[in-house]
């Protein structure tokens, strides 16, 4: 555990580092797809983790998506995720986490979504994260363009550093 890590983050310290792997996506309005992903969790000594994510196409490495933000721990067992997307969307998700026996699980749901005038409509998001040892997996559900909340993305990542 880093010496300067804020004590409120001790339970989530195993997330720190760089994770990489592959995922897949689907939604009724698009063709299913696969992607390569890198996620970095870092810290600055305050009671939040810095989160940065980017994806590329499996076929040709073309950039697909990115998001950046903060994973806050307002109280033990509670998390708040604050993210910005270059597609013109911001999101605030709140939820819970548990950390026991080398397993971290988080469940979050949006409480607020902001959109620029040119962003595609997104009305709901929720995320589930599970870290076991050196594997991090997640599922993202989305409600968008008039459709209800449903599965959109899932990935399995391995710790790189």
UniProtKB/Swiss-Prot annotation:
Keywords: Heme, Iron, Isomerase, Metal-binding. Heme b binds at residue 152. A motif (GXWXGXG) lies at residues 17-23. Its cofactor is heme b. It catalyses: peroxynitrite = nitrate. It is an enzyme of class 5 (isomerase). Transmembrane segments: none annotated. Pathway: Nitrogen metabolism. Binds 1 heme b group per subunit, that coordinates a highly solvent-exposed Fe(III) atom. InterPro entries: Calycin, Nb(III)_bact/plant, Nitrobindin, PeroxynitIsom, THAP4-like_heme-bd. It comes from the Bacteria. Its EC number is 5.99.-.-. Coiled coil: none annotated. One of its GO terms (molecular function) is heme binding. It holds the Pfam family THAP4_heme-bd. PANTHER family: PEROXYNITRITE ISOMERASE THAP4, THAP4 PROTEIN. HAMAP family: nitrobindin. Homodimer. Heme-binding protein able to scavenge peroxynitrite and to protect free L-tyrosine against peroxynitrite-mediated nitration, by acting as a peroxynitrite isomerase that converts peroxynitrite to nitrate. Therefore, this protein likely plays a role in peroxynitrite sensing and in the detoxification of reactive nitrogen and oxygen species (RNS and ROS, respectively). Is able to bind nitric oxide (NO) in vitro, but may act as a sensor of peroxynitrite levels in vivo. Belongs to the nitrobindin family. Forms a 10-stranded antiparallel beta-barrel structure able to accommodate a hydrophobic ligand in its interior. In fact, this fold hosts the heme group, which is located in a wide surface cleft. This is Peroxynitrite isomerase 2. It comes from Mycobacterium marinum (strain ATCC BAA-535 / M). The lineage of its organism: Bacteria, Bacillati, Actinomycetota, Actinomycetes, Mycobacteriales.
